[in-house]
Amino acid sequence: AVPTTVHCDHLIQAATGAAADLVAAEETNKEVYDFLRSAAMKYGMGFWKPGSGIIHQVVYENYACPGTMMVGTDSHTPNAGGMGTIAIGVGGADAVDVMTNQPFMTKMPKLVGIKLTGKLSGWTSAKDVILRVATMLTVKGGTGKIVEYFGEGARNMSATSKGTITNMGAEIGATTSTFGYDDMMDPYLRATDRGPIADLCKQYAEQLRSDASVEADPGKYYDEVHEIDLNTLEPHIVGPHTPDLGRTVSAMSAEVDEKGYPEKLSAALIGSCTNSSYEDMTRSVSLVRQAKAAGIKAQTSLLVTPGSETIYQTIKRDGILQEFEDAGATVLANACGPCIGQWKRDDMKKGDKNSILTSYNRNFAKRNDGNPETLGFISSPELVVAMAFGGSMKFNPLTDSLKDKDGNDFKFQPPAGEVLPPNGYTPQDAGYEVPTMSGEVVISPTSERLSFLEPFAKQDPAKDYQDLPVLFKAKGKCTTDHISQAGPWLKFRGHLDNISNNMFLGATNAFHPETGSGNNPVTGEENQELNKIARNLRDQGLGWVAFADENVGEGSSREHAAMEPRHMGCRAFVANSYARIFEANLKKQAVLPFTFADKADYDK
């Protein structure tokens, strides 16, 4: 079978800090962790225990390498593309196929080439490259495409910077994003104790990167070609509520006034699988040092998420962790945390309009803290830290000044950091458990969080697809977050029937004014939750259909966004277009994904 690992990164809620939060998670989620560990041990899967890190950072440090291919059940799996891996995010059913030596199939993708010229410097980072790409191509511009970065600017960029870019290829809907092998990957492989692999890559370097003719005439080899000059690229901020609404930091102040965004920055958060490398942390802490020397304190809460136990132990050893804490930052557990909605936020009431700035990858409404009025903006960790000291969405650290302890003007100097730790990564226990190929997998029959999957009832094409009632019509975005919310619902991911109670809770229904609600098309009962209506129809032996507009199922690869509708009686979706993973997941669950022949029919 294909080598497989299990990672526990979604269920640790950020509340008070890493140590206490991890203890609370292990107590609260014990039966889930025990189940995952026992399944991994019995069936030969490597197990990365809770607190070991976010899957993509752990994979980058241990598995990602040039010339390999992998699939992962998370949309940000293409993070590994920064190391020259073809890494594709898939749903669970597709992953099971691969795990059991069945073929993985996807639509033949088109190829997009993005030529990077120049070199990153000053305030501009790899995050600004992908934020610029998202702004250019939009959240559906990469659908059905593989994006390859090439050129001088790609070759002189650090390996971890490359991972930041390919990670957020998920935000443009790309099948995957990747870089060809170059000399910047070699030191990272060796620093992460993979010298033999580094030697092999050097030996086969010519086979692991494009021929010179591709760079000389990219239009001959790619279906689309775009170019970004890193010498002139400005730092970007995207949001709110979508990762493709971008502008330069210099344009942000005017837009705050124009759009009426809350100016005060209510929270600043750095880390996540997108930006938690040693380079990210050292560049960010360089700004903390400048502020400390000037006697300037952060004007908002600052939360720091190390991506893995390796990163955590290394920045702790090097004193970086202490510098963040001395500046008032809260260091969170090595997990997804607020990025996936696992944030016990007490400083803001639901319904209070506020602005937060993160170095994360996704910023849909309600995603981070469950508050629909929280406006989530995304930028580089360097910009997030600097703006935390400014305390305002209008503060531009490239040009604006603050007052130091003596009342004099203080202006941040550009951040500086180390690509790799000078003293190496710490050799501490990273949290990996070798499978024993023994034991039993046990699920309590009374568990509210775990249940064995049962086969769905067989459908009769002659009668089960006739005269289907319409459950709802999505208005605006209909991401996987809208279909199956994360946050507190993540604890039910192992129990299909219970988690189905969140189906469409976040979706806006064109037929009803209240989010997640509608009217029963059969009984006529009004103002009910859509999941309750669906359950009622299913229990009467009736299927139903849902309608949506463009790029339905954008965002997370969570398979529950397809499993829940199937479990609750959905026979088909009809939409103008689909995100790749969601469309594949629907097909795997035998829910038909139809597309309007005429897009205007959606509005009829």
Pin down the residues of each PLM region.
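Long, structured ligand/cofactor-binding scaffold of large enzymes
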Residues: 1-109, 492-546, 551
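Short internal beta-strands
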Residues: 2-11, 115-117, 148-150, 180-181, ...
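Flexible loop/turn segments at secondary-structure boundaries
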Residues: 13-16, 54-57, 77-79, 120-122, ...
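Accessory "access/gating" subregions that flank catalytic or transport cores
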Residues: 23-27, 37, 41, 47-49, ...
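Structured alpha-helical segments in the cores of large, soluble enzyme domains
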Residues: 32-40, 93-106, 126-140, 165-166, ...
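A glycine- and small-aliphatic-rich helix-loop capping segment at beta-alpha/alpha-beta transitions
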Residues: 62-64, 83-105, 136, 282-291, ...
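Mobile "lid/hinge" segments at catalytic clefts and subdomain interfaces of large enzymes
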Residues: 67-200, 335, 342-431, 587-588
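Cytosolic catalytic domains that perform sulfur/thiol-centered chemistry
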Residues: 246, 286, 319-321, 326-328, ...
